[in-house]
Amino acid sequence: MSKQTPDKLCAIEDDANPILEKVRACDVLILASPVYFSRLSGTMACFIDRTRCFTFGKNGHLALKGKVGVALAVGWCRNLGMETTLASLHGAFLVHEMLTPPCHAAGALYGVGVVSGQRDENFIYKRDKLGAKDDQEGLYSVKLLVQEAVRVAKKLTNER
């Protein structure tokens, strides 16, 4: 972090730097992860680790403070790690002092989980790898939560 400059958030030269610049510029940050072994994916964990430049960097210090964060998870089953994945994403937002608005209408206090493992009439899982598109409740909850996040971000922008 000591080598950070206004134009260079991270000393590691890779394709994350342009993404980190977009994260710094956003008003609403939506992080979505698949659920693997009752937790967020390793790729998402690595990405979150790279955002430490916004908390501990000399030029990016608290760059995400006051921005709005939305946590989403996609899992095969409704209750096999959705909550822990959402909690990890939510925790990252809190470390950055971001706002994570709940949406009671969506039943979303920490984010939204969408189920990809849909069952047939015999309660047997279908083999559809795009089953998340059939989770109407989950997708509608995502829509409501994102609308709430945008509403909060607009309100914050108007107050500045």
Task: Give, region by region, the residue ranges found by the protein language model.
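Helix-loop-strand module that forms the ligand-binding subsite of alpha/beta enzymes
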Residues: 5-109
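Charged, often glycine-rich, active-site loop that binds/positions anionic groups
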Residues: 1-8, 116-120
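Glycine-rich phosphate/pyrophosphate-binding loop and the adjoining helix
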Residues: 94, 99-160
